[in-house]
């Protein structure tokens, strides 16, 4: 099968035209000391995990701020999830050439497991561009949230995206390529993942 182009510039242009302005980034300590007497702000900081038990990095040499460890594709017609182990560079590279079969009209969703380190990440989003036969057919842009660095009591975060229904019909069947990105409010892209699915007949 010929490799499809991953040029999704038309979608990128839409995002780059966004006029939303992001405030200056603060360190973990700055957030912890911010308006200490403000009760509502204190609750917001607590919801981000900004407590006194924030621990040093497990791997001090790792400069990544968002580490996506695993993605699971949950399909209602399959007994077990399809799991992408993203801690392995070889697995990440192999995903681009694989196509995971999903039956038409199936209900599916993604579960993302990740950790945050070094600093608070705000406005993390999962952005996915989808092509079929070289033509851009869809874009997904889901808000994941804002997160403080993980601790021993919270070693990772887990987020499930909304359910979707696989297309059906003769024209809808076939191979779809996807490019997934994890982008924050600073427009930092923490991971780009190339993968794909094949929609098959029931």
Swiss-Prot record:
The keyword Disulfide bond does not apply. SUPFAM superfamilies: E set domains. It comes from the Eukaryota. Keywords: Acetylation, Cytoplasm, GTPase activation, Phosphoprotein. It is found in: Cytoplasm. The modification N-acetylalanine is found at residue 2. The modification Phosphoserine is found at residue 40. It holds the Pfam family Rho_GDI. The keyword Membrane does not apply. GO terms for biological process: actin filament organization; regulation of vacuole fusion, non-autophagic; Rho protein signal transduction. GO terms for cellular component: cellular bud neck; cellular bud tip; cytosol; membrane; plasma membrane. The modification Phosphothreonine is found at residue 27. GO terms for molecular function: GTPase activator activity; Rho GDP-dissociation inhibitor activity. Regulates the GDP/GTP exchange reaction of the Rho proteins by inhibiting the dissociation of GDP from them, and the subsequent binding of GTP to them. Belongs to the Rho GDI family. Present with 1670 molecules/cell in log phase SD medium. This is Rho GDP-dissociation inhibitor. It comes from Saccharomyces cerevisiae (strain ATCC 204508 / S288c).
């Amino acid at each position: 099968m010929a490799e499809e182009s991953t040029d999704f510039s038309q979608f990128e242009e839409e995002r780059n035209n966004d006029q939303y302005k992001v405030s200056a980034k603060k360190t973990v300590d700055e957030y912890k000391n911010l308006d200490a007497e403000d009760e509502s702000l204190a609750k917001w900081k607590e919801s981000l995990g900004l407590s006194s038990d924030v621990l040093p990095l497990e791997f001090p040499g790792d400069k990544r701020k968002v580490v996506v460890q695993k993605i699971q594709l949950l399909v209602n017609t399959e007994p077990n999830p399809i799991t992408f182990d993203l801690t392995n560079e070889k697995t990440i590279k192999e995903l681009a050439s694989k196509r995971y079969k999903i039956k038409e009209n199936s209900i599916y969703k993604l579960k993302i497991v990740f950790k945050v380190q070094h600093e608070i990440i705000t406005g993390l989003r999962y952005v996915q561009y989808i092509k079929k036969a070289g033509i851009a057919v869809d874009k997904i842009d889901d808000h994941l949230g804002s997160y403080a660095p993980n601790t021993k009591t919270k070693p990772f975060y887990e987020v499930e995206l909304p359910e979707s229904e696989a297309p059906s019909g003769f024209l809808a069947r076939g191979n779809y390529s996807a490019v997934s990105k994890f982008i924050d409010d600073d427009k930092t892209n923490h991971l780009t993942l190339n993968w794909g699915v094949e929609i098959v007949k029931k």
